[in-house]
């Protein structure tokens, strides 16, 4: 296992200065190191920007924390102790990959590399020839801080000016033991917005030989769409920015830009066949792909490891990737998860098992499918119901065999009739919503239920459900599937929704997240 030892925050990334990158014998990983075609740019800055992309993923942590996981009982094992801790919403003691400690170090390490690049560009006088690199560094810095806030802070809401943030690193650190204040979540989001908006206008797509491993314009627009969706305002003015940036990615007719789910479903779920196709850089639906050191690829493989605290067949058939919906029964869904006789887990094959000394995982960070659902949600919040229904129709035609057009009335009627979820007795995708912002009963709420349902189906295994749970104040439960008992519950105001910062950071003097309601 790969263990990282971090101080209160990483200091200079000395290895990044020499362009150190992850290397693997796997074909996909061999393509990850930057092969930028230099166009009058500085080689060292270009190499340094490779390290501005984090080599960590929160997907395992987020999936374990969310309602996409159950305790299937002691008959089944778990891969590492942290899976048990994270599933039970405990403050994690372990420090290997996929833990909060690893994520903290990975994201701040990438931020340090971005800041070093920005400093080097500044020392050259910020020449126009380096604008693309400056833009890429700014967007990387914004993204990493955004992810840290998504992990270690509450969801952004009207109390953000009173909620703990995370340190926003804007300079190259030159002291051995600096002290940092966390500030507020409001301050973090404002700085993310500043860096993102400045950076996105500077990015150029012309300098990359493998663009899908970089923030191209479209990838940056997709990030902006998701960021503004999370940057929720009581009047939903943020949704105008979501629609704007998502439309820059998708245009007015997104159908041809979405993933070919039918073709993907025809590939074998064994080995890496389907998984490799899902993460292929040649796929137009993939806007940004990452290479990370993570066990999540192993847990999501056909090696059948660690199934105890995991997505199981009960969840699949009642709430997620084999559930019924507007499209009809699960027979209408193209993509089917991997499972086998006597095996409780139900696994969507979205990343293969790649071993290059460590276990590697290749997440798709941004895709056209997810960006489409960001726009559909923004339309629904703005009460632009026909436009939202049109985007939902585009999703349905791509993801299912049902090619019919959906109307707002049809969506409203379907989810209005659906019973609300209760553990064990009424297992449906429809859960009580208690967000900080106001949702109207009826049409608006039911279209949002639809979007939350199909996003959960589409992005299963990719960590997107946990932010939705936080944003919408969804009550979730820990269920023992053997005893048929609820062992814990997490209401909307539960302080554990802000995952605890690493212990060594707390010991070094940083304010921890509170733990008593």
Ranges and model annotations:
Residues 149-156, 207, 230-236, 381-383:
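Short coil/turn linking the two alpha-helices of tandem helical-hairpin repeats
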């Amino acid at each position: 296992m790969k263990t990282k030892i971090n101080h209160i925050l990483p200091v200079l990334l000395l290895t990044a200065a020499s362009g150190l990158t992850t290397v693997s014998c796997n074909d996909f990983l061999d393509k990850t190191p930057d092969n930028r075609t230099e166009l009058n740019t500085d080689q060292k800055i270009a190499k340094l920007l490779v390290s501005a992309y984090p080599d960590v993923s929160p997907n395992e942590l987020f999936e374990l924390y969310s309602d996409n996981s159950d305790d299937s009982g002691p008959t089944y094992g778990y891969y590492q102790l942290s899976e048990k801790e994270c599933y039970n919403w405990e403050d994690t003691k372990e420090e290997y990959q996929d833990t909060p400690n690893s994520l903290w170090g990975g994201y701040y390490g990438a931020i340090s590399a971005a800041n070093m690049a920005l400093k080097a560009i500044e020392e050259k006088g910020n020449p126009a020839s380096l604008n693309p690199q400056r833009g890429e560094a700014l967007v990387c810095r914004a993204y990493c801080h955004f992810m840290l806030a998504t992990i270690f802070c509450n969801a952004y809401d009207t109390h953000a000016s009173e909620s703990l943030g995370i340190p926003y690193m804007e300079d190259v650190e030159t002291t051995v033991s600096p002290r940092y204040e966390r500030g507020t979540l409001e301050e973090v989001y404002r700085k993310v917005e500043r860096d993102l908006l400045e950076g996105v206008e500077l990015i150029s797509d012309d300098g990359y030989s493998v663009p899908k491993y970089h923030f191209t314009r479209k990838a940056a627009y997709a990030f902006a769409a998701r960021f503004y969706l999370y940057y929720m305002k009581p009047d939903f003015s943020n949704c105008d920015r979501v629609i704007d940036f998502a439309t820059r990615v998708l245009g007015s007719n997104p159908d041809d830009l979405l993933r070919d789910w039918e073709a993907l479903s025809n590939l074998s779920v064994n080995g890496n066949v389907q998984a490799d196709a899902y993460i292929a850089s040649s796929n137009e639906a993939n806007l940004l792909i990452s290479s990370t050191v993570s066990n999540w690829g192993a847990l999501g493989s056909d090696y059948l490891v660690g199934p105890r605290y995991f997505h199981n067949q009960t969840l699949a058939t009642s709430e997620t990737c084999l559930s019924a919906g507007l499209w009809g029964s699960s027979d209408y869904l193209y993509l089917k998860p991997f499972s086998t006789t006597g095996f409780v887990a139900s696994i969507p094959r979205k990343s293969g098992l790649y071993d290059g000394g460590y276990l590697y995982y290749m997440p798709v960070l941004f895709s056209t499918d997810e960006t489409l659902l960001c726009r559909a949600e923004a339309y629904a919040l703005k009460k632009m119901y026909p436009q939202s229904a049109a985007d939902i129709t585009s999703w349905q035609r791509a993801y299912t065999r049902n090619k019919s057009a959906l109307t707002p009335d049809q969506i409203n009627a379907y989810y209005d009739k659906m019973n609300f979820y209760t553990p064990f007795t009424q297992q449906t995708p429809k859960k009580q919503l208690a967000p900080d912002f106001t949702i109207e009963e009826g049409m608006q709420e039911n279209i949002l239920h639809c979007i939350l349902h199909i996003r959960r189906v589409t992005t299963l295994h990719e960590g997107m459900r946990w932010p939705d749970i936080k944003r919408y104040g969804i009550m979730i439960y820990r269920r023992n599937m053997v005893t048929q008992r609820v062992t814990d519950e997490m209401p909307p105001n539960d302080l554990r929704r802000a995952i605890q910062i690493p212990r060594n950071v707390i010991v070094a003097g940083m304010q921890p997240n509170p733990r008593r309601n």
